[in-house]
Regions:
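Generic recognition of cysteine residues
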Residues: 25-27, 153, 257, 371
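Exposed, interaction-prone extracellular/peripheral surfaces
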Residues: 1-8, 18, 187, 220, ...
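An amphipathic, basic-hydrophobic helix/alpha-beta surface used to engage anionic
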Residues: 48-301, 344-348, 362
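Extracellular/lumenal glycan-associated context and N-glycosylation machinery
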Residues: 1-67, 79
Length: 415
């Protein structure tokens, strides 16, 4: 009973409720002191109207049931949402009770993990069974975790005298992954390291070894020496030998998350998207790829080649933020024991080549192969070229991009 009264008082404006009760009391006094058929008829009409107005406050929007569905990547055969995509939200509501409801205003609030929010408001006209449907589309969303707060429902009676409010909570949250771009090839100069023992290679794709790894379907153009005759005889269709590929040294992607290094949030989003795209490239090439995010609380993922670990890295990039106040070299010193020797150390950072050269020297002393990807603003082209040439003069593979579309060409062109 206490809960019902609380819902009733929360969903109805006190001023309008007081006005309705005042009119009913005046009619009651009119019947008591005046009497007669006219006063009795007026009191009966006002009483029925009061019962309807107050009764609507105990039901209707205070007992609305809803179900929400988020439609985005699932429409294209997957469940993953990427930054820049719009999300289609479908909200189905059911209003219990027999009292008619002319319309209902629904207010939705979508909140991002960093505090940003978007508000959506529209009207729903319930049918005779009290069911209604609201469909709306969000603007293009950036990476992050999103959740809907409590839904607010507002309705009025058929006379427009009383306004009723109610709140319902439907737990709905989803994650938006960083933007990625397809990288067809990555030319990298892996120099011979005395500590790491790797060899000099500049390759856009891994060469095949003589070790047979399995059997695959015949592809037009395969040499006769590649045909697997035993498998062809057993299956009745042409089969070819599948050879193992040369393995690239493990790659460690280091994302610089300095709070002072990035001019604005979009520049950091570009760095995150570049890291995610390179992780996807490593999965495509079956190369062991790891991730180190130099945030306020640095986190490291060891190089791995299976899909589960790759998805963990991508999911981690959803929540990462540029909040580190200390120098990058200090963050690396705390975790350098976990960096594999001989690995390719790719630094993604907005720092200039002069500042990055100190990091590159540190990488070389730890027996790793340095590589630098500079994230710049589009209006800093001249500064970017001077910065990159400084590292290129030392034989370090260096790239510079100011937008995600430039990444495939920059990596494919080499240093």
């Amino acid at each position: 009973m206490r809960r019902a009264v609380s819902l009733f008082l929360n969903g109805m404006q006190p001023s309008r409720l007081a006005a309705v009760l005042a009119v009913w009391c005046l009619c009651l006094l009119y019947v008591l002191f005046q009497g007669g058929k006219t006063s009795l008829m007026l009191f009966s009409m006002v009483s029925l109207l009061t019962i309807y107005l107050i009764g609507a406050g105990f039901g209707g929007v205070n007992r609305v049931k809803a179900q929400r569905r988020v439609l985005g990547g699932a429409e294209h055969g997957g469940e993953q949402l990427h930054a820049g995509e719009q999300v289609r939200v479908k909200l189905e509501v059911h209003v219990p009770g027999l009292l008619p409801m002319p319309y209902m205003i629904v207010r939705e609030v979508l909140q991002r993990h960093n505090g940003d929010s978007w508000s959506f408001e529209d009207s729903v006209i319930p049918n005779l069974r009290g069911a209604g449907k609201l469909v709306f589309q969000t603007p293009p969303l950036e990476r992050g975790r999103y959740a809907f707060s409590k839904t607010e429902c507002i309705s009025e009676d058929i006379f427009g005298l009383m306004e009723h409010k109610g709140r319902i909570e439907v737990q709905t949250d989803f994650r938006v992954l960083p933007r990625t771009i397809y990288i067809p090839k990555w030319q990298r100069n892996i120099r011979n390291s005395r500590l790491g023992g790797t060899h000099t290679t500049i390759s856009a794709s891994r060469r095949e070894t003589t070790q047979i790894n399995g059997v695959r379907d015949y592809v037009y153009g395969d040499r006769i020496s590649r045909i697997h005759w035993n498998a062809t005889a057993k299956t009745g269709s042409w089969k070819s030998k599948e050879f193992e590929h040369e393995s690239f040294p493990r790659t460690m992607i280091v994302l610089d998350c300095s709070a002072d290094g990035y001019a604005h949030a979009q520049q950091f989003e570009l760095a995150v998207s570049a890291a995610a795209s390179l992780i996807e490239y490593g999965a495509k090439e079956h190369a062991g790829t790891g991730l180190f995010t130099a945030t306020r609380e640095a986190q490291m993922f060891a190089p791995a080649d299976h899909a589960g670990e790759r998805m963990r890295m991508i999911q981690h990039l959803v929540d990462v933020d540029y909040d580190r106040k200390t120098k990058l070299i200090a963050s690396l010193e705390k975790s350098y024991r976990h960096f594999p020797k001989g690995a390719l150390f790719l630094l993604i950072s907005p720092m200039s080549g002069k500042d990055a050269s100190e990091i590159m020297r540190w990488v070389e002393t730890r027996g790793m192969n340095p590589c630098f990807l500079q994230i710049t603003n589009s209006n800093e082209t001249k500064k970017r070229d001077d910065s990159i040439s400084l590292l290129q003069s030392r034989g370090i593979s260096s790239y510079s991009v100011s937008s995600l579309d430039e990444l495939p060409a920059a990596l494919g062109g080499g240093a």
